[in-house]
Amino acid sequence: MEKIMKKDDIQTDYIIYDNLAMTSKKTRFITNSQQLLRWDVEKNTYSKINEKKLIKTMHSLIDETDFIVISDYNKGVCSDLLLKDTIKAANHKEIKVFVDPKGSDFYKYKNAYCITPNTLETRAVYNGPLKDDKDFEKACKFICDTFSIKTCVITRGKDGMTVYESNTFSHIRSNPKDVFDVSGAGDTVIATLATYKTRGESLINSAKIANLAAEHVVGKFGTTPITEQELNKYL
């Protein structure tokens, strides 16, 4: 992975290795170039020593940062302490924090700028129905009010997105032609959303661009990124 990152001129100086942790093994079941399901084998053995290293690294880099994306895979890396320290430091510097959550405890993301749960992740914290636009509006408001998060973008798969900001709701429709592999769609959404929002786009326009990026990513086989040049063709 580090070799691939270096080949693409991605900085690798701050990667932290843990020789005691087990790398997740993900087995994908494919038919006709479409992913049916995935089987994961893993252990959450992340150490407190690495938590301290991450916090120290975060503080050393925050002055060079335009925005922060927290992609929580619920593997032990995104500890409560790391999240609390990161969000607090970012807010002190007026840096926006975007969170792709996991699990049923969204309190650990308190005071983040934006959270982007999918429908399944929303169900983990919201007990109301999720059938139509109004239901998703209520869920967005509940998440922001309950967990003190400024904005919310719920990704709804083929039904698009619901965006909540300053007591205003917007719905973005999705139109994927063919869905071959949803792997990486959430990462594509939050990376695109954060990039365009930080460049000065409104949250709703940033979400529209992120939705468009995700549409094209799921139409490719495998975990495939979309380049800015590709995305510009569709804007």
Task: Describe the function of each predicted region.
Residues 1-69, 225-235:
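Conserved N-terminal subdomain of the carbohydrate kinase-like
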Residues 39, 125-126, 164, 217, ...:
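Residues that scaffold the ATP/ADP-binding catalytic core of kinase and kinase-like folds
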Residues 59, 141, 211-215:
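Solvent-exposed alpha-helix faces
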Residues 68-71, 118:
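Residue-level signal for inorganic ion chemistry
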Residues 69, 86, 97-99, 105-108, ...:
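Extended, hydrophobic alpha-helical segments in both membrane/secreted and soluble proteins
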Residues 75-169:
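Conserved phosphate/ATP/ADP-binding segment of small-molecule kinases
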Residues 146-151, 175-234:
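Conserved post-catalytic alpha-helical subdomain immediately downstream of the catalytic base
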Residues 169-170, 227:
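ATP-dependent carboxylate/acyl-activation modules
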